Amino acid sequence: GMYCTPCESFWTESQLVDGKCPDCGRPVQKAQEEAYFFKLSKYADALLDLFENTPEFLQPDTRRNEMIAFVKQGLEDLCISRSTFDWGIPVPINEKHVMYVWLDALSNYITALGWPDEPELYEKYWPVNVHLVGKEIVRFHTIIWPAMLMSAELPLPKQVLGHGWLLL
């Protein structure tokens, strides 16, 4: 697919805006490499149900409406490994691959609490009441992260607040 290096994001051709990254507006490059994928498309209905029937999960409404529209476009399966460079966390079943940056970054919310090996802190603090995130990473925190948690049958954060930018 198409890849935006500054955003560390993969896009389909139809998601591009004038051939550029829809998030930052920069040029994208065609990426072709061996990779593992997470079946994100499997969770589209569950995510739509979450957004539409639990509106407090994602606020403000403008962010929730953006994510509903994004999911309704059709979710592509998510590339979760890279094989064209060697920095990063190795994939345990194939050391020629490293984890996609957002996969390990999002999982840090629970692995930093000791999940799954030392669950005391995880059980005390998860699920969190609120994730406060910038608008440019709402998609990762309200589509990819919940789908990852759903696949592991773990509870979701109770709410995600996607704030705008403060410009001074």
Each predicted region: which residue ranges?
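Structured secondary-structure scaffolds
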Residues: 3-6, 20-168
